[in-house]
Amino acid sequence: MNTSLQDLEQEILAAVRHEVVPALGCTEPICVALAAAIGRTHLSSAPEKIAVRVSGNLMKNAMGVTVPGTGMVGLSIAAAVGAIGGDAEAGLQTLKSISAEDVAAAKKMLADDAVSVSMADTDHIFYAEVTLTAGAEIARVCIADTHTNVVLIEKNGKTIYQKPVAAADEKNPVAVFTKITAKDVFDFATTVDLEKIRFIKEAATLNSALSQEGLRTDYGLHIGRSLQKNIGNGLLSDDLLNRIIIETGAASDARMGGASLPAMSNSGSGNQGIAATMPVVVVARHLKSSEEKTIRALFLSHALAIYIHAKLPTLSSLCAANTAAMGSAGACAWLFSERFEAVSDTICSMIGDVSGMICDGAANSCAMKVISSITSGYKSMLMALDNTRVTGFEGIVEHDLERSINNLCALARESMQHVDQQIIDIMVQKPMH
């Protein structure tokens, strides 16, 4: 490892630890559940009414996803069950201990029309505000910019916590990834002391358990189980690509379908964590890779996913499971070849293939997009292993990996922001019955 990377070692490790964390349930509704749980701690009795206001992008990512343990979709049930049974100290695992009684009480609040959800007029791409009323008491909690970043707590109109301006503008936890290149990420992952990155094994443990749950039970669109059945009836072969698709898709099915198991997330998203983890797990098993090589590949995958996502808005109209799959495809290329050129060629070909995939909100159909992304990754990896790739003469892809990634992310930051608004407009206007 070169000297400059050694100097940044602690920052890189801290950034990956910050971005790769367990999360129970899709993180947008869970963010609202967390705000409600925090608000409840400032009331002397259970809330009688809850009002939720969120940014358009958060609304988009919460309309169609099942809240774990409830069997219901949307922000209303997330807020109600968070207020009644959520753990205010558990972050993205705030719903880990909810009971059947909590869920029943939350559903009664919805039946009594005691929970309202509306769009907030805010400049924040990511914003959630939950106001709880119990008798004469009112508690209000605001989360902004990231899923657990509480910026304001009020009780009865008086501020009892406000994140200081200095803290609100504190250094971006992934800022280190703006100082380095993809080649630096590769060099770091393949040479850093193994014990310092061993923690990434938990991603394989958690997301593999989620995958097995998705293969045992019908969740969401149960794509993983459907494809598995088609191996049994001869319509699909039991090859490496289909094993990657089935095991990764099943984890996403369970994640989006409300399984009460945590995913190891990446950049605030369980699906991104799944897309960055499961292909590596399956390929490492296929190749009978050593523990060290598997750990390094997992770290490389997650670090590349963070590296690309650091150039994107927190939420956008670009499907970020796709960019996370670029990390895992690159890591799988390394497992096969141990060459950075194969990693680079794989990612460039993916950018030339599926970079236009839109995000139209978190939903069961995310599993299909995860599968499409990792299928592109597998094709691109095989091309790279055969020393071919989408070239710099084609579309937004350039000869250089860094410039190709920057071009993709520029689309998401700029022109696709207009696409995002139209997606939100369509989603909030369509009939839901």
UniProtKB/Swiss-Prot annotation:
Top-level lineage group: Bacteria
GO molecular function: L-cysteine desulfhydrase activity
One of the protein's GO biological processes: L-cysteine catabolic process to pyruvate
Record InterPro entries: Ser_deHydtase-like_asu, UPF0597
Family membership noted in the UniProt record: Belongs to the UPF0597 family.
HAMAP family, alphabetized: UPF0597
Protein name per the record: UPF0597 protein DNO_0106
